[in-house]
A protein has these predicted regions:
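ATP-binding Walker
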Residues: 14
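Post-Walker A helix-loop "phosphate-sensing" segment adjacent to the P-loop in P-loop NTPases
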Residues: 25-33
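ATP-dependent small-molecule kinase phosphotransfer cores
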Residues: 37-92, 96-99
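Conserved phosphate-donor/acceptor-positioning beta-strand/loop module used by diverse small-molecule
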Residues: 93-97, 107-129
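Hydrophobic anchor at the beta1->P-loop junction of P-loop NTPases
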Residues: 8
Length: 185
């Protein structure tokens, strides 16, 4: 039993979720991995679509009962992939944090392709400020600083895609569609 997983990884505001949405729209045969998290939903996020939002107690219960494939702490919140989230018979795609990637790498039954989504600091900050009507600037700064440390070195990246501009994003989607097609044969 093996799971094929494309993992998108990148700093806050890099556009990981947008890229994943576009890839799933273009390739409906993909299994979109919806992670669990203990953080609160951001404006516009929907439970079961963007994440499964759970309490710390609920998350701990999922881990203890073996219902989590991987679990990690990132930027003061817990994130994880439920056992039922990955499908053996599909190409799985999801957004993961560095600790989640490291956990997935420990599993011998996971064929993992890690794609780093890159955008400039300026564009990432602008995107985060524009994401919500009343952004929490302190939280944006905290995440920015934490990301600098957490993403300093990622030795487990297979590809890096430029998501800095609309044109770059369109080219990244085109290239990622080629990666998906290669997987699917």
């Amino acid at each position: 039993m093996a799971y094929n997983v494309i993992a998108l990884i990148g700093e806050a505001g890099s556009g990981k979720d947008t890229l994943m949405r576009k890839l799933v729209e273009a390739n409906p045969q993909l299994n979109e991995v919806v992670s669990y998290t203990t953080r609160s939903p951001r404006e516009g996020e929907v439970d079961g679509v963007n994440y499964h939002f759970v309490t710390g107690e609920e998350f701990g219960e999922l881990v203890v009962t073996g219902k989590m494939f991987e679990a990690s702490c990132f930027n003061d919140w817990f994130y994880g992939t439920g056992v039922d989230s990955l499908k053996e018979d599909k190409l799985n795609i999801g957004v993961f944090n560095p600790e989640g990637i490291e956990s997935l790498l420990q599993h011998k039954n996971v064929n993992l392709t890690v794609i780093r989504v890159w955008a400039s600091d300026k564009n990432r900050l602008i995107r985060q400020l524009n994401r919500e009507e009343f952004p929490d600037v302190d939280e944006i700064i905290r995440r920015y600083k934490a990301d600098r440390e957490d993403f300093e070195s990622l030795p487990f990246t297979h590809y890096v895609v430029d998501n800095n501009t609309l044109e770059a994003m369109e080219e990244s989607i085109r290239l990622l569609n080629l990666v998906v097609k290669e997987y699917l044969g």
